[in-house]
Swiss-Prot record:
The keyword Membrane applies. The keyword Kinase does not apply. This is Tyrosine transport system permease protein. It is a multi-pass membrane protein. One of its GO terms (biological process) is amino acid transport. It is found in: Cell membrane. CDD domains: TM_PBP1_branched-chain-AA_like. Belongs to the binding-protein-dependent transport system permease family. One of its GO terms (molecular function) is transmembrane transporter activity. Its main location: membrane. The complex is probably composed of two ATP-binding proteins (CDR20291_0806), two transmembrane proteins (CDR20291_0807) and a solute-binding protein (CDR20291_0805).
Length: 295
């Protein structure tokens, strides 16, 4: 039972990261490879702060701020220096690896003996749920504002937004900052929940986030009343429990990437198959009606 609760808590924390990836991957259509580094940066900042006697709350806020800064750098490289979006993310990811290692001073820092958010009186799963709820509500509210609609517009049709006299570069940078801030928040919470920070803990973060997005949106795309943010949170749960049950059946931790790839392929293939069937049916219906009229 404790194992399931632990997986649920981790799913909640990782869903915050998935919400951050959603902004760049789904809204901005920006392949931000720096997500792995931003996630680890959140953990690194918290580890450094806690070991130096800084409050867990302040440490978590610092992690968010540093994540936003990472997004800002990615945006500047792409917008101001005209470096491609993919390469900008890769460059920042590489820089963050060295920066995170420099921040921590070593590759791994245990946090069990330090006071942090998850070893207080509040239950870890309740605290994680509170963070997810706040992030989801704030993101939903933001996306309903004029700035939020502009952010969506930049991803859908940047030329139209540009024709309105809006600086699309600034909007992209803002989106990257929010995205990486959420990802760093997730990393900081995960480090506190697990009780350690590791320089390699962010590897695969982007893939995990994309998997949660694909699973959630594929499952709930027919239900228009369900928001994407809700679908992504559920997708994160489904993905994490898929991994959990696969590990319970005896699969090795080295098989995680294989499992992830299979899960993503399965949901993508299912979604594409449904689209193909709809198109085929749409073509067949008029022909059937014509035959009936002839008869």
């Amino acid at each position: 039972m404790s194992g399931i609760i632990s997986v649920m808590t981790q799913s909640l924390i990782l869903s915050i990261m998935a919400l951050g990836v959603y902004i760049t991957y789904k809204i901005l259509d920006f392949p931000d490879m720096s997500a792995d580094g931003s996630y680890t940066m959140g953990a690194s900042i918290v580890a450094f702060s806690l070991t130096n006697g800084i409050s867990p709350v302040v440490a978590t806020l610092m992690a968010i701020l540093c994540g936003c800064t990472a997004g800002l750098v990615t945006g500047i490289l792409h917008i101001k220096f005209k470096i491609s979006n993919l390469l900008s993310g890769i460059l920042v990811m590489g820089m963050l690896y060295s920066i995170n290692l420099r921040i921590m001073g070593k590759s791994n820092i245990p946090l069990f003996s330090f006071k942090h958010l998850f070893n207080g009186e509040i239950s870890p799963i309740v605290l994680a749920l509170a963070f997810v709820f706040i992030c989801k509500i704030l993101l939903d509210l933001f996306l309903k504002t004029g700035l939020g609609y502009t952010l969506k517009g930049v991803g859908d049709n940047s030329q139209m937004i540009k024709s309105l006299g809006i600086n699309i570069g600034s909007i992209k940078i803002l989106g990257l900052m929010i995205s990486n801030g959420l990802i760093a928040l997730s990393g900081s919470l995960m480090a506190q929940f697990l009780g350690f920070s590791d320089v390699n803990m962010g590897i695969g973060t982007l893939v995990l986030g994309i998997a949660s997005i694909i699973i959630g949106i594929t499952l709930f795309k027919k239900f228009t009343f369900i928001k994407d943010t809700t679908a992504i949170i559920v997708g994160s749960f489904i993905y994490q429990f898929t991994i959990y049950f696969a590990m319970s059946l005896g699969m090795l931790s080295t098989d995680l990437k294989l499992i992830t790839a299979i899960v993503i392929i399965a949901f993508l293939a299912t979604g594409n198959l449904n689209i193909s069937l709809k198109k085929t049916n749409a073509k067949l219906v008029p022909k059937i009606n014509q035959k009936k009229e002839v008869l």
